[in-house]
Amino acid sequence: MKIRIGHGFDVHKFGAARPLILCGVEVPYETGLVAHSDGDVVLHAISDAILGALALGDIGKHFPDTDAAYKGADSRVLLRHCYALARAKGFVLGNLDVTIIAQVPKMAPHIEAMRQILAADLTSELDDINVKATTTEHLGFTGRKEGIAVEAVVLMTRKHD
């Protein structure tokens, strides 16, 4: 069996007059995230982790913010595309670990719904998907409630014939 590890990181600032979407879940908050797509910073980090594990670049290469086709794009569609690229190379998700770094809003009420969506989109078992949240204790831009950062780590596996 061949394994690959990928790490993804993304940041978006608050300020868009749109819903806050994280892992495909609408999280109640006063503002959304500024982005070319729907601003789902979590799915962007996961997509980058998958692409990175397979040496396929990053989401900016695959979905450039200079391309009008991706304006307001549903990040779940982008994630599923990245995962399809991995599957085409014979890889499947072993497990996923995500850390959402945000002072606001509270993530705990939404974590299970996020995990369910990720398991469905990545055709994985729920116990292979972990989503957790933390704050920076009011330090830095996330602590000042200016935006959200996310780190994602994936283990991708391929079984040899």
Curated annotation (Swiss-Prot):
Swiss-Prot/TrEMBL site (Transition state stabilizer) positions: H36, T135
Entry keywords, A to Z: Isoprene biosynthesis, Lyase, Metal-binding
GO biological process: isopentenyl diphosphate biosynthetic process, methylerythritol 4-phosphate pathway; terpenoid biosynthetic process
Catalytic activity: 4-CDP-2-C-methyl-D-erythritol 2-phosphate = 2-C-methyl-D-erythritol 2,4-cyclic diphosphate + CMP
Domain of life of the source: Bacteria
Function: Involved in the biosynthesis of isopentenyl diphosphate (IPP) and dimethylallyl diphosphate (DMAPP), two major building blocks of isoprenoid compounds. Catalyzes the conversion of 4-diphosphocytidyl-2-C-methyl-D-erythritol 2-phosphate (CDP-ME2P) to 2-C-methyl-D-erythritol 2,4-cyclodiphosphate (ME-CPP) with a corresponding release of cytidine 5-monophosphate (CMP).
Family of this protein: Belongs to the IspF family.
Protein name per UniProt: 2-C-methyl-D-erythritol 2,4-cyclodiphosphate synthase
Originating species: Shewanella baltica (strain OS223)
Protein's gene: ispF
